[in-house]
Amino acid sequence: MAIIEAENLTVSYYGDIDILKDVSFEAEEGRITTIIGPNGAGKSTLLKTLYGLLIPKTGTIRFRGKSITGLKVHRFIHTGIAYVPQLRSIFPDLTVRENLELGTWIFKKDRKRVDRAIDEVCERFPILGEKRKTRAGLLSGGQQKILEIGRSLLTRPSVCLLDEPTATLAPRIAEQIYRTMVDLKSEKITVVMVDQRVRQAFDVSDHLYILELGRNKASGTRHEFEGSLKEMIKGWLT
């Protein structure tokens, strides 16, 4: 059953050239769905639209069957949808702990709930507990990405939207991120990601969507794409 879905989305920046053209998408609950395609295909634009950062010119977005098209961004955290952008979103002059606390504003002043949520994230990512008093700007790139993902999980979302979560990371750290996605799936959390490490993302995904030039090119399960993915990627590079 689809937990988040979009139908016939057309999206542009500043009302000019359409970046997404009649794109449809759905992600099943408790599954990993990956959006792949060549540069400029509209992958990140789709994630931003699903999270309400961009308003579609046409089309509908639904979460658990209810329309969330045009919902204000600050309300998305209350719906159970989290988003980690491609560009770094940490506050470098704040400590790891302070960065995490910023992700708990929904709990208001319930200190016990805040502490419990942060402890759970630090248990999932021990490095965050070890570095909790360290300024975030002093962390490695991989540790900063772990901090961003950890912060997104503080509210126990139903859906995590991850834009290029392994970009520029060392293979060892990227593998840790992929393992985290599999762990989230085991906890019935839906993961929707954009990723350029196609082979590795393919291996952990249940379903894939391929975008080209802002349009749906193909979609299917990992097994349905076995054998054809290599040729498809080769076509993007020529």
What are these regions (language model features)?
Residues 204-219, 226-238:
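C-terminal boundary and immediately downstream tail of ABC-type ATPase nucleotide-binding domains
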Residues 152-153:
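ABC ATPase C-loop
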Residues 59-68, 79, 113-118, 220:
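Conserved ABC transporter NBD signature motif
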Residues 36-38:
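The feature captures the beta-strand-to-loop junction immediately N-terminal to the Walker
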Residues 51:
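Helix-to-loop junction immediately C-terminal to a conserved catalytic motif
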Residues 14-15, 96-113, 124-126, 220:
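ABC-type ATPase nucleotide-binding domains, specifically the catalytic core motifs of the NBD
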Residues 135-139:
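Conserved ABC ATPase signature
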Residues 1-3, 10-22, 72-73:
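A short, flexible loop at the N-terminus of ABC-type nucleotide-binding domains that lies
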